Regions:
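Nucleic-acid substrate recognition interfaces
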Residues: 1-274
């Protein structure tokens, strides 16, 4: 089961500057990757004479990347590139947002995964909308670009982040490409999986996700032992079962009386102050 330990980082600290810089890099990379995906999507529906300069530029990047791929790939008819394909395009063309100075490579790869996941979610939503449009408020829209000067959440893996313990028994998490650390206290709930860094109302929240490696108990698919619960007012709960155990009735009148007294006292206090 997964657990998270959250730490908030205020402005004016070196750790905040690290978070802010990388969140801007993540934002720029998301827009750059989405731009290439969208250009390939629109170009797949056009003839060579109808292509725009942006579409031609991106198609040139794709063709250049294909020359360096160990296993040749082709762009699907929809024009949507998979994560692996998109990663190769950004990598082999030495994209400046992908290789932004100080931006961890695993964080960059996770941003590309997020772009492809957002597009896959869009196509799934469109497919469902075509079948059951009444379940939506409107036709699903393509993922939008993020604010040009904005920030966005980025994720670092446990290959870049490490959990350490001091001589006093305190735990902390080291982060990639910085000497700053995240203090976690006297205990951690398991094995570190990944670290999420999210902008939040002028601060940053660092969420360390752990796996306690305890298997979640799956509910039984057999419905042999069942209980029915009917909540009410005078009868707070009526509980019946097919297990041969006594049925239960919980009297709700005492709680109802307490609630009425509470409401009366609140009304008296409000009337005295108005």
């Amino acid at each position: 089961m997964y657990h998270s330990v959250n730490v908030q980082v205020k402005q004016g600290t070196a750790l905040f500057q690290w978070c802010d810089y990388n969140a801007h890099c993540a934002n720029n990379l998301y827009n750059a990757a989405l731009f290439r995906e969208r250009q390939m999507m629109t170009s797949s529906k056009k003839t060579i004479h109808e292509l725009t300069d942006n579409e031609l530029e991106v198609m040139s990047e794709v063709e250049n990347a294909k020359q360096w791929m160990t296993r040749p790939r082709e762009v699907p008819p929809s024009g949507v590139m998979s994560y692996t394909f998109l990663n190769d395009v950004m990598r082999f063309n030495c994209n400046p947002d992908y290789y932004a100075e100080g931006f961890p490579i695993h964080c960059a790869q996770n941003i590309l995964k997020q772009v492809t996941q957002d597009l896959n979610s869009f196509f799934k939503a469109v497919k469902k909308w075509n079948v059951a449009p009444w379940e939506f408020n409107g036709k699903p829209k393509l993922p939008e670009y993020k604010h040009k000067q904005g920030t966005t959440t980025f994720v670092s893996s446990n290959q870049e982040c490490r959990i350490h313990q001091t001589k006093r028994g305190n735990y902390y998490c080291s982060l990639p490409k910085t000497k700053e650390i995240v203090h976690l206290g006297k205990s951690v709930p398991g094995k570190l999986i990944e670290v999420h860094i999210s902008p939040m109302h002028g601060i940053y929240q660092i969420s360390c996700v752990f796996d306690d490696e305890v298997e979640t108990v799956q509910p039984s698919k057999k419905h042999e032992r069942m209980v029915g619960v009917d909540p009410g007012v005078n009868t707070l709960l009526a509980v019946v079962n097919n297990c041969g155990m006594p049925n239960l009735l919980f009297n709700g009148r005492p709680l109802k009386s307490i609630n009425q007294l509470y409401n009366k006292q609140i009304a008296n206090i409000v009337s005295e102050n108005t």
